[in-house]
UniProtKB/Swiss-Prot annotation:
Keywords: Endonuclease, Exonuclease, Host cytoplasm, Host nucleus, Host-virus interaction, Hydrolase, Nuclease. Interacts with major DNA-binding protein; this interaction increases the nuclease processivity of the alkaline exonuclease. It is found in: Host nucleus; Host cytoplasm. This is Alkaline nuclease. InterPro entries: Herpes_alk_exo (IPR001616), PDDEXK-like_dom_sf (IPR011604), Restrct_endonuc-II-like (IPR011335), Viral_alk_exo (IPR034720). The gene is MDV024. Gene3D superfamilies: 3.90.320.10.
Length: 524
Protein backbone atom coordinates (compact mmCIF):
# COMPACT_ATOMS: atom_id res chain seq x y z
CA UNK A 1 0.00 0.00 0.00
CA UNK A 2 1.59 3.27 -1.11
CA UNK A 3 1.18 6.18 1.22
CA UNK A 4 1.41 8.90 -1.39
CA UNK A 5 -2.24 8.58 -2.29
CA UNK A 6 -3.22 9.42 1.26
CA UNK A 7 -1.79 12.94 1.47
CA UNK A 8 -3.56 15.15 -1.12
CA UNK A 9 -2.54 18.76 -0.49
CA UNK A 10 -3.31 21.92 -2.42
CA UNK A 11 -0.53 23.61 -4.40
CA UNK A 12 -0.64 26.71 -2.22
CA UNK A 13 -0.35 24.57 0.86
CA UNK A 14 2.60 22.67 -0.63
CA UNK A 15 4.38 25.91 -1.55
CA UNK A 16 3.77 27.35 1.87
CA UNK A 17 4.98 24.15 3.51
CA UNK A 18 8.40 24.57 1.86
CA UNK A 19 8.79 27.96 3.52
CA UNK A 20 7.71 26.67 6.90
CA UNK A 21 9.49 23.32 6.91
CA UNK A 22 12.20 24.59 9.28
CA UNK A 23 11.64 25.97 12.73
CA UNK A 24 8.04 24.80 12.98
CA UNK A 25 5.95 25.43 16.08
CA UNK A 26 2.28 24.51 16.34
CA UNK A 27 -0.40 24.56 19.00
CA UNK A 28 -1.26 20.89 18.58
CA UNK A 29 -2.33 19.03 21.73
CA UNK A 30 0.84 17.94 23.40
CA UNK A 31 2.35 16.13 26.30
CA UNK A 32 5.89 15.49 27.48
CA UNK A 33 7.02 13.72 30.58
CA UNK A 34 8.85 15.02 33.58
CA UNK A 35 9.90 12.47 36.18
CA UNK A 36 11.05 8.89 35.98
CA UNK A 37 7.99 6.84 35.01
CA UNK A 38 9.57 3.67 36.30
CA UNK A 39 10.25 5.04 39.79
CA UNK A 40 8.45 3.75 42.83
CA UNK A 41 6.96 7.17 43.46
CA UNK A 42 5.14 7.00 40.15
CA UNK A 43 3.33 3.83 41.14
CA UNK A 44 1.60 5.58 44.00
CA UNK A 45 1.29 9.01 42.37
CA UNK A 46 -2.24 10.46 42.33
CA UNK A 47 -3.90 10.36 38.95
CA UNK A 48 -4.26 14.13 38.60
CA UNK A 49 -0.65 14.69 39.64
CA UNK A 50 0.43 12.86 36.49
CA UNK A 51 -1.18 15.65 34.47
CA UNK A 52 0.81 18.29 36.35
CA UNK A 53 4.05 16.56 35.31
CA UNK A 54 3.23 16.60 31.61
CA UNK A 55 3.98 19.90 29.89
CA UNK A 56 3.69 20.99 26.23
CA UNK A 57 6.92 20.46 24.35
CA UNK A 58 7.25 17.94 21.55
CA UNK A 59 4.24 16.19 20.06
CA UNK A 60 3.62 13.67 17.33
CA UNK A 61 2.17 16.61 15.41
CA UNK A 62 5.51 18.42 15.73
CA UNK A 63 7.25 15.31 14.48
CA UNK A 64 5.03 15.05 11.39
CA UNK A 65 5.56 18.68 10.42
CA UNK A 66 9.31 18.40 10.89
CA UNK A 67 9.92 14.99 9.33
CA UNK A 68 7.24 14.37 6.66
CA UNK A 69 7.52 16.32 3.41
CA UNK A 70 4.03 16.57 1.89
CA UNK A 71 5.63 16.92 -1.56
CA UNK A 72 7.32 13.53 -1.31
CA UNK A 73 4.75 11.44 0.53
CA UNK A 74 4.86 8.64 -2.03
CA UNK A 75 8.28 7.67 -0.72
CA UNK A 76 7.45 8.32 2.91
CA UNK A 77 8.12 5.72 5.57
CA UNK A 78 5.47 3.31 6.74
CA UNK A 79 3.38 5.07 9.45
CA UNK A 80 4.59 2.67 12.14
CA UNK A 81 8.20 3.76 11.60
CA UNK A 82 7.19 7.39 12.02
CA UNK A 83 5.46 6.48 15.27
CA UNK A 84 8.49 4.59 16.59
CA UNK A 85 10.97 7.29 15.59
CA UNK A 86 8.81 9.82 17.41
CA UNK A 87 8.89 7.59 20.50
CA UNK A 88 12.68 7.40 20.22
CA UNK A 89 12.82 11.21 20.02
CA UNK A 90 10.70 11.51 23.18
CA UNK A 91 12.93 9.10 25.09
CA UNK A 92 16.10 10.88 23.95
CA UNK A 93 14.64 14.25 24.92
CA UNK A 94 13.64 12.89 28.31
CA UNK A 95 17.18 11.59 28.86
CA UNK A 96 18.78 14.86 27.77
CA UNK A 97 16.54 16.84 30.12
CA UNK A 98 17.23 14.48 33.00
CA UNK A 99 13.63 13.32 33.29
CA UNK A 100 14.50 9.76 32.23
CA UNK A 101 17.37 7.62 33.43
CA UNK A 102 19.52 6.63 30.47
CA UNK A 103 20.35 3.15 31.74
CA UNK A 104 16.66 2.21 31.83
CA UNK A 105 16.08 3.07 28.17
CA UNK A 106 19.45 2.41 26.56
CA UNK A 107 18.41 -1.06 25.42
CA UNK A 108 15.74 0.37 23.15
CA UNK A 109 17.86 3.24 21.77
CA UNK A 110 20.82 0.94 21.07
CA UNK A 111 18.85 -0.63 18.21
CA UNK A 112 17.49 2.58 16.68
CA UNK A 113 20.02 2.40 13.83
CA UNK A 114 18.67 -1.03 12.86
CA UNK A 115 15.17 0.39 12.76
CA UNK A 116 16.37 3.29 10.60
CA UNK A 117 18.15 0.99 8.14
CA UNK A 118 15.10 -1.25 7.81
CA UNK A 119 12.72 1.68 7.34
CA UNK A 120 14.67 2.95 4.33
CA UNK A 121 14.17 -0.26 2.39
CA UNK A 122 10.73 -1.20 3.69
CA UNK A 123 7.91 1.31 3.37
CA UNK A 124 5.13 -1.19 2.73
CA UNK A 125 5.02 -3.30 5.90
CA UNK A 126 6.79 -3.25 9.28
CA UNK A 127 9.79 -5.46 9.95
CA UNK A 128 10.28 -7.97 12.74
CA UNK A 129 12.55 -5.44 14.43
CA UNK A 130 9.77 -2.84 14.36
CA UNK A 131 7.54 -5.40 16.05
CA UNK A 132 10.16 -5.84 18.76
CA UNK A 133 10.15 -2.09 19.33
CA UNK A 134 6.39 -2.15 19.78
CA UNK A 135 6.77 -4.87 22.39
CA UNK A 136 9.41 -2.82 24.21
CA UNK A 137 7.10 0.22 24.19
CA UNK A 138 4.35 -1.96 25.68
CA UNK A 139 6.67 -3.08 28.48
CA UNK A 140 7.64 0.54 29.27
CA UNK A 141 4.03 1.63 29.77
CA UNK A 142 2.53 -1.15 31.88
CA UNK A 143 1.56 1.31 34.62
CA UNK A 144 -0.93 2.76 32.12
CA UNK A 145 -2.56 5.88 33.63
CA UNK A 146 0.22 6.10 36.24
CA UNK A 147 2.84 6.24 33.49
CA UNK A 148 3.82 9.55 31.90
CA UNK A 149 5.04 7.73 28.80
CA UNK A 150 1.66 6.03 28.43
CA UNK A 151 -0.06 9.41 28.23
CA UNK A 152 2.49 10.78 25.77
CA UNK A 153 2.51 7.83 23.40
CA UNK A 154 -1.31 7.67 23.22
CA UNK A 155 -1.61 11.08 21.59
CA UNK A 156 -2.86 11.06 17.99
CA UNK A 157 -3.76 7.37 18.31
CA UNK A 158 -7.15 5.78 17.71
CA UNK A 159 -7.41 3.99 21.05
CA UNK A 160 -9.77 1.12 21.82
CA UNK A 161 -11.30 2.95 24.78
CA UNK A 162 -12.05 6.23 23.00
CA UNK A 163 -12.56 5.47 19.30
CA UNK A 164 -15.91 6.39 17.79
CA UNK A 165 -17.81 3.98 15.56
CA UNK A 166 -20.00 4.98 12.63
CA UNK A 167 -23.54 3.56 12.29
CA UNK A 168 -22.33 1.34 9.43
CA UNK A 169 -19.83 -0.40 11.71
CA UNK A 170 -16.65 1.38 10.61
CA UNK A 171 -14.28 3.48 12.69
CA UNK A 172 -14.74 7.23 12.56
CA UNK A 173 -11.27 8.68 12.04
CA UNK A 174 -12.35 12.33 12.12
CA UNK A 175 -11.07 14.53 14.92
CA UNK A 176 -8.02 12.39 15.65
CA UNK A 177 -6.04 15.26 17.16
CA UNK A 178 -7.48 15.44 20.63
CA UNK A 179 -6.12 15.95 24.09
CA UNK A 180 -5.77 12.43 25.49
CA UNK A 181 -4.95 13.63 28.98
CA UNK A 182 -7.54 12.74 31.62
CA UNK A 183 -9.72 15.59 32.79
CA UNK A 184 -8.99 17.03 36.21
CA UNK A 185 -10.98 15.26 38.86
CA UNK A 186 -12.82 12.00 38.49
CA UNK A 187 -16.41 10.94 38.82
CA UNK A 188 -17.41 8.62 41.63
CA UNK A 189 -17.94 5.78 39.16
CA UNK A 190 -14.41 6.18 37.74
CA UNK A 191 -12.94 6.23 41.24
CA UNK A 192 -14.88 3.07 42.08
CA UNK A 193 -13.38 1.34 39.06
CA UNK A 194 -9.87 2.61 39.75
CA UNK A 195 -9.93 1.44 43.36
CA UNK A 196 -11.41 -1.97 42.69
CA UNK A 197 -9.74 -3.01 39.43
CA UNK A 198 -6.89 -4.74 41.28
CA UNK A 199 -9.46 -6.63 43.38
CA UNK A 200 -11.25 -7.76 40.22
CA UNK A 201 -7.92 -8.80 38.71
CA UNK A 202 -7.11 -10.94 41.73
CA UNK A 203 -10.50 -12.67 41.49
CA UNK A 204 -9.90 -13.42 37.81
CA UNK A 205 -6.37 -14.66 38.45
CA UNK A 206 -7.49 -16.90 41.32
CA UNK A 207 -10.73 -18.27 39.85
CA UNK A 208 -10.41 -18.16 36.07
CA UNK A 209 -6.78 -18.54 35.10
CA UNK A 210 -5.50 -22.07 34.82
CA UNK A 211 -2.21 -22.66 36.61
CA UNK A 212 -1.07 -24.64 33.57
CA UNK A 213 -1.47 -21.55 31.39
CA UNK A 214 1.62 -19.93 32.90
CA UNK A 215 4.83 -21.85 32.48
CA UNK A 216 8.53 -21.29 32.16
CA UNK A 217 9.83 -19.64 29.03
CA UNK A 218 9.89 -22.13 26.15
CA UNK A 219 9.43 -24.91 28.73
CA UNK A 220 13.06 -24.54 29.74
CA UNK A 221 14.40 -25.31 33.20
CA UNK A 222 14.95 -21.64 33.90
CA UNK A 223 12.06 -20.28 35.91
CA UNK A 224 10.25 -17.28 34.47
CA UNK A 225 10.11 -14.37 36.89
CA UNK A 226 6.49 -13.90 35.88
CA UNK A 227 5.51 -17.48 36.67
CA UNK A 228 2.26 -17.97 38.58
CA UNK A 229 3.00 -21.32 40.17
CA UNK A 230 4.07 -19.88 43.51
CA UNK A 231 1.69 -20.09 46.43
CA UNK A 232 0.21 -17.30 48.51
CA UNK A 233 -0.92 -13.83 47.49
CA UNK A 234 -1.11 -13.52 43.72
CA UNK A 235 1.16 -11.14 41.87
CA UNK A 236 -1.51 -9.72 39.59
CA UNK A 237 0.86 -7.11 38.14
CA UNK A 238 2.45 -9.74 35.94
CA UNK A 239 -0.79 -9.77 33.96
CA UNK A 240 -0.76 -5.99 33.46
CA UNK A 241 -0.42 -4.67 29.93
CA UNK A 242 1.02 -1.43 28.61
CA UNK A 243 0.18 0.47 25.46
CA UNK A 244 0.05 -1.81 22.44
CA UNK A 245 0.56 0.15 19.22
CA UNK A 246 -0.93 -1.42 16.11
CA UNK A 247 1.97 -3.14 14.36
CA UNK A 248 0.13 -3.01 11.03
CA UNK A 249 -0.53 0.75 10.81
CA UNK A 250 1.00 2.53 13.80
CA UNK A 251 -2.20 4.54 14.21
CA UNK A 252 -4.31 2.43 16.56
CA UNK A 253 -3.61 1.54 20.15
CA UNK A 254 -4.96 -0.53 23.02
CA UNK A 255 -4.13 -0.99 26.71
CA UNK A 256 -5.65 -4.24 27.90
CA UNK A 257 -6.53 -4.79 31.55
CA UNK A 258 -5.09 -8.32 31.70
CA UNK A 259 -3.04 -10.43 29.28
CA UNK A 260 -2.34 -14.04 30.22
CA UNK A 261 1.14 -14.31 28.79
CA UNK A 262 4.63 -14.93 30.12
CA UNK A 263 7.34 -12.30 29.86
CA UNK A 264 11.10 -12.64 29.53
CA UNK A 265 13.62 -11.24 32.00
CA UNK A 266 13.32 -7.80 30.38
CA UNK A 267 9.55 -7.76 30.87
CA UNK A 268 8.86 -8.29 27.15
CA UNK A 269 5.86 -10.44 26.18
CA UNK A 270 7.19 -13.93 25.43
CA UNK A 271 4.50 -16.63 25.09
CA UNK A 272 5.52 -20.25 25.46
CA UNK A 273 5.96 -22.31 22.33
CA UNK A 274 3.03 -24.50 23.37
CA UNK A 275 0.65 -21.57 23.93
CA UNK A 276 -1.91 -21.67 21.14
CA UNK A 277 -4.29 -19.19 22.77
CA UNK A 278 -3.72 -15.88 24.58
CA UNK A 279 -6.47 -14.98 27.03
CA UNK A 280 -7.25 -11.30 27.58
CA UNK A 281 -9.67 -9.66 30.03
CA UNK A 282 -11.44 -6.32 29.91
CA UNK A 283 -12.68 -5.42 33.40
CA UNK A 284 -15.75 -3.32 34.15
CA UNK A 285 -16.51 -2.43 37.77
CA UNK A 286 -20.22 -1.56 37.85
CA UNK A 287 -20.67 1.34 40.24
CA UNK A 288 -24.44 1.41 39.71
CA UNK A 289 -24.72 -1.68 41.95
CA UNK A 290 -22.57 -0.22 44.75
CA UNK A 291 -25.25 -0.11 47.45
CA UNK A 292 -24.97 0.30 51.20
CA UNK A 293 -26.41 -2.78 53.00
CA UNK A 294 -27.27 -0.73 56.10
CA UNK A 295 -29.57 1.54 54.12
CA UNK A 296 -32.84 -0.28 53.53
CA UNK A 297 -33.56 -0.42 49.83
CA UNK A 298 -34.95 -2.89 47.35
CA UNK A 299 -31.42 -3.67 46.21
CA UNK A 300 -30.13 -4.32 49.74
CA UNK A 301 -33.13 -6.56 50.48
CA UNK A 302 -32.56 -8.56 47.29
CA UNK A 303 -28.93 -8.88 48.32
CA UNK A 304 -29.96 -10.34 51.67
CA UNK A 305 -32.24 -12.86 49.95
CA UNK A 306 -29.46 -13.74 47.50
CA UNK A 307 -27.06 -14.38 50.37
CA UNK A 308 -29.68 -16.55 52.08
CA UNK A 309 -30.87 -18.61 49.09
CA UNK A 310 -27.92 -18.51 46.66
CA UNK A 311 -30.28 -19.22 43.76
CA UNK A 312 -30.25 -18.02 40.17
CA UNK A 313 -33.76 -16.63 40.68
CA UNK A 314 -32.63 -14.21 43.38
CA UNK A 315 -29.45 -13.43 41.45
CA UNK A 316 -31.66 -12.37 38.55
CA UNK A 317 -33.91 -10.38 40.89
CA UNK A 318 -30.84 -8.66 42.32
CA UNK A 319 -29.57 -7.62 38.87
CA UNK A 320 -32.97 -6.36 37.72
CA UNK A 321 -33.73 -4.36 40.87
CA UNK A 322 -32.12 -1.17 39.54
CA UNK A 323 -33.59 0.94 36.74
CA UNK A 324 -30.78 0.21 34.25
CA UNK A 325 -29.66 -3.36 34.96
CA UNK A 326 -26.37 -4.57 33.50
CA UNK A 327 -28.19 -7.32 31.55
CA UNK A 328 -30.67 -6.32 28.85
CA UNK A 329 -33.32 -8.69 27.48
CA UNK A 330 -34.28 -8.70 23.79
CA UNK A 331 -36.77 -10.80 21.86
CA UNK A 332 -35.30 -13.70 19.84
CA UNK A 333 -36.91 -12.29 16.67
CA UNK A 334 -35.40 -8.85 17.23
CA UNK A 335 -32.00 -7.25 17.83
CA UNK A 336 -30.68 -5.93 21.15
CA UNK A 337 -30.41 -2.29 22.10
CA UNK A 338 -26.92 -0.82 22.42
CA UNK A 339 -27.62 0.19 26.03
CA UNK A 340 -25.94 -2.61 28.01
CA UNK A 341 -22.80 -4.71 27.50
CA UNK A 342 -24.52 -7.97 28.52
CA UNK A 343 -27.67 -9.28 26.85
CA UNK A 344 -29.94 -12.31 26.76
CA UNK A 345 -32.96 -13.59 24.86
CA UNK A 346 -33.72 -16.34 27.36
CA UNK A 347 -37.38 -16.16 28.49
CA UNK A 348 -36.44 -16.62 32.14
CA UNK A 349 -34.78 -13.20 31.96
CA UNK A 350 -37.81 -11.52 30.39
CA UNK A 351 -38.63 -9.39 33.42
CA UNK A 352 -38.73 -5.77 34.49
CA UNK A 353 -37.78 -2.79 32.36
CA UNK A 354 -35.88 -4.90 29.82
CA UNK A 355 -39.02 -6.84 28.91
CA UNK A 356 -40.93 -3.59 28.40
CA UNK A 357 -38.30 -2.04 26.16
CA UNK A 358 -37.90 -5.27 24.20
CA UNK A 359 -41.61 -5.20 23.36
CA UNK A 360 -41.55 -1.54 22.31
CA UNK A 361 -38.59 -1.29 19.96
CA UNK A 362 -37.50 -2.49 16.55
CA UNK A 363 -33.73 -2.34 16.23
CA UNK A 364 -31.55 -2.00 13.16
CA UNK A 365 -28.11 -3.59 13.07
CA UNK A 366 -25.19 -3.25 10.68
CA UNK A 367 -23.34 -6.22 9.19
CA UNK A 368 -20.67 -6.28 11.91
CA UNK A 369 -23.26 -6.35 14.69
CA UNK A 370 -25.52 -8.95 13.08
CA UNK A 371 -22.63 -11.29 12.33
CA UNK A 372 -21.19 -11.11 15.83
CA UNK A 373 -24.63 -11.47 17.37
CA UNK A 374 -24.91 -14.80 15.58
CA UNK A 375 -21.46 -15.85 16.81
CA UNK A 376 -22.12 -14.96 20.46
CA UNK A 377 -25.81 -15.72 21.05
CA UNK A 378 -25.21 -19.32 22.16
CA UNK A 379 -22.45 -18.41 24.61
CA UNK A 380 -22.91 -18.48 28.39
CA UNK A 381 -21.39 -16.50 31.23
CA UNK A 382 -19.89 -17.84 34.45
CA UNK A 383 -20.86 -16.28 37.78
CA UNK A 384 -19.19 -16.39 41.20
CA UNK A 385 -20.93 -15.23 44.38
CA UNK A 386 -18.99 -13.99 47.42
CA UNK A 387 -20.09 -14.25 51.01
CA UNK A 388 -20.27 -11.67 53.76
CA UNK A 389 -16.96 -10.89 55.48
CA UNK A 390 -16.14 -12.93 58.57
CA UNK A 391 -15.39 -10.17 61.07
CA UNK A 392 -13.65 -12.54 63.48
CA UNK A 393 -11.09 -13.76 60.95
CA UNK A 394 -11.36 -10.82 58.51
CA UNK A 395 -11.87 -13.30 55.68
CA UNK A 396 -14.00 -13.47 52.53
CA UNK A 397 -14.75 -16.62 50.53
CA UNK A 398 -16.67 -17.50 47.38
CA UNK A 399 -19.98 -19.19 48.18
CA UNK A 400 -21.49 -22.37 46.80
CA UNK A 401 -24.70 -21.87 44.84
CA UNK A 402 -27.77 -23.82 45.96
CA UNK A 403 -26.87 -26.41 43.30
CA UNK A 404 -23.70 -27.23 45.22
CA UNK A 405 -21.54 -25.74 42.48
CA UNK A 406 -19.11 -22.89 42.96
CA UNK A 407 -19.67 -21.49 39.47
CA UNK A 408 -23.08 -20.71 37.97
CA UNK A 409 -23.59 -20.81 34.20
CA UNK A 410 -26.19 -18.37 32.85
CA UNK A 411 -27.48 -17.65 29.29
CA UNK A 412 -25.97 -14.17 29.11
CA UNK A 413 -23.60 -13.08 26.35
CA UNK A 414 -21.72 -10.02 25.09
CA UNK A 415 -23.63 -7.38 23.14
CA UNK A 416 -21.97 -6.63 19.76
CA UNK A 417 -23.82 -3.32 19.60
CA UNK A 418 -22.33 -2.01 22.85
CA UNK A 419 -19.17 0.07 23.07
CA UNK A 420 -17.52 -2.49 25.38
CA UNK A 421 -17.77 -5.19 22.70
CA UNK A 422 -16.26 -2.91 20.07
CA UNK A 423 -13.54 -1.90 22.50
CA UNK A 424 -12.67 -5.57 23.01
CA UNK A 425 -12.81 -6.17 19.26
CA UNK A 426 -10.30 -3.38 18.62
CA UNK A 427 -8.12 -4.61 21.50
CA UNK A 428 -8.08 -8.08 19.97
CA UNK A 429 -7.15 -6.64 16.58
CA UNK A 430 -4.19 -4.74 18.02
CA UNK A 431 -3.08 -7.62 20.29
CA UNK A 432 -3.19 -10.12 17.42
CA UNK A 433 -0.13 -8.42 15.92
CA UNK A 434 1.93 -9.26 19.02
CA UNK A 435 1.43 -13.02 19.19
CA UNK A 436 1.95 -14.39 15.68
CA UNK A 437 -0.48 -17.14 14.77
CA UNK A 438 -1.76 -17.54 18.32
CA UNK A 439 -5.46 -16.93 18.80
CA UNK A 440 -6.62 -14.06 21.00
CA UNK A 441 -9.34 -15.29 23.37
CA UNK A 442 -11.02 -12.25 24.96
CA UNK A 443 -13.33 -12.09 27.98
CA UNK A 444 -15.45 -9.34 29.50
CA UNK A 445 -15.28 -9.34 33.31
CA UNK A 446 -18.09 -7.64 35.24
CA UNK A 447 -17.32 -6.91 38.90
CA UNK A 448 -20.07 -5.96 41.35
CA UNK A 449 -19.16 -4.84 44.86
CA UNK A 450 -20.99 -3.11 47.69
CA UNK A 451 -20.17 -0.34 50.12
CA UNK A 452 -19.03 -1.29 53.60
CA UNK A 453 -21.00 -1.52 56.80
CA UNK A 454 -19.86 0.57 59.75
CA UNK A 455 -18.30 -2.52 61.34
CA UNK A 456 -16.30 -3.19 58.15
CA UNK A 457 -14.80 0.29 57.75
CA UNK A 458 -11.02 0.54 58.04
CA UNK A 459 -10.50 -3.22 57.89
CA UNK A 460 -8.35 -5.25 55.54
CA UNK A 461 -9.92 -8.54 54.49
CA UNK A 462 -8.13 -11.67 53.30
CA UNK A 463 -9.60 -13.16 50.14
CA UNK A 464 -9.56 -16.96 49.82
CA UNK A 465 -10.56 -19.09 46.83
CA UNK A 466 -12.55 -21.44 49.09
CA UNK A 467 -13.31 -22.09 52.75
CA UNK A 468 -11.19 -25.21 53.19
CA UNK A 469 -8.33 -25.32 55.68
CA UNK A 470 -5.84 -25.80 52.83
CA UNK A 471 -6.95 -22.61 51.11
CA UNK A 472 -4.43 -19.76 51.04
CA UNK A 473 -4.87 -16.01 50.91
CA UNK A 474 -4.81 -14.81 47.30
CA UNK A 475 -5.42 -11.10 47.89
CA UNK A 476 -5.63 -8.54 50.68
CA UNK A 477 -8.66 -6.28 50.24
CA UNK A 478 -7.66 -2.80 51.40
CA UNK A 479 -9.93 -0.51 53.48
CA UNK A 480 -10.81 1.73 50.52
CA UNK A 481 -11.95 -1.17 48.36
CA UNK A 482 -15.47 -2.55 48.07
CA UNK A 483 -16.76 -5.82 49.46
CA UNK A 484 -16.98 -8.22 46.48
CA UNK A 485 -20.46 -9.53 45.70
CA UNK A 486 -20.47 -10.94 42.16
CA UNK A 487 -18.00 -11.67 39.38
CA UNK A 488 -19.35 -12.39 35.88
CA UNK A 489 -17.00 -13.70 33.19
CA UNK A 490 -18.34 -13.51 29.63
CA UNK A 491 -16.48 -14.92 26.61
CA UNK A 492 -16.36 -12.66 23.55
CA UNK A 493 -16.25 -14.32 20.13
CA UNK A 494 -14.48 -12.25 17.46
CA UNK A 495 -14.37 -12.79 13.70
CA UNK A 496 -10.97 -11.59 12.54
CA UNK A 497 -12.13 -11.25 8.93
CA UNK A 498 -13.36 -7.81 10.02
CA UNK A 499 -9.79 -6.81 10.89
CA UNK A 500 -9.29 -5.65 7.30
CA UNK A 501 -11.64 -2.72 7.82
CA UNK A 502 -9.79 -1.70 10.99
CA UNK A 503 -6.45 -1.76 9.19
CA UNK A 504 -7.84 0.41 6.40
CA UNK A 505 -9.08 2.88 9.02
CA UNK A 506 -5.59 3.06 10.51
CA UNK A 507 -3.96 3.94 7.19
CA UNK A 508 -6.72 6.43 6.43
CA UNK A 509 -6.25 8.06 9.83
CA UNK A 510 -2.56 8.65 9.16
CA UNK A 511 -3.28 10.35 5.86
CA UNK A 512 -6.00 12.48 7.40
CA UNK A 513 -3.71 13.46 10.27
CA UNK A 514 -0.95 14.63 7.92
CA UNK A 515 -3.47 16.52 5.78
CA UNK A 516 -4.97 18.20 8.83
CA UNK A 517 -1.65 19.27 10.32
CA UNK A 518 -0.24 20.72 7.10
CA UNK A 519 -3.51 22.43 6.19
CA UNK A 520 -3.58 23.99 9.64
CA UNK A 521 0.06 25.03 9.30
CA UNK A 522 -0.66 26.70 5.96
CA UNK A 523 -3.31 28.85 7.61
CA UNK A 524 -0.95 30.16 10.27
Amino acid sequence: MELGTKFPLSKSCKDESRKRKRGITIDCDSQILVGDEQSNSTKTKPYDEICENIVPNYTFGNYILQKIDPNDCRHSLHPLYHRLFYIADVIKQGISEGSLLENKYSYILETEHILLDESRINNLSPSIHASRWCKMVESLTRLQANSELWHIFRQCLLTASSVKWSPNGTINTAGLITNDLPSRGQTESILFGTRNESLAKSLIAALCVSQSSVRTIDNSDKKNEFDNTTTGILDIEKYSCGLMIDIRTGMLGASLDMVMCNRNRHGILAPCLTDNNIETYEIKCRFKYAFCPEMRSELSQCYERLMATKTVQWFRRFLYTIDCPCVDYFRPDNYPRAKEALITSDDDWKVGHSAYHAAQSRIKCNEFEMHHLTLNKNMSSRVWLFGEPDLQTNSIYPLLWNTGERVLSIPIFANPRHQNFKQIFLQSYVASGYFGNRKIVPFLATFIGRHRRQTELGRCFSLFVDDTEASEVVYEITPEQAIPVILIITPVIIDNTFYVGIEESGYRAFGELVDHLWAKQCRI
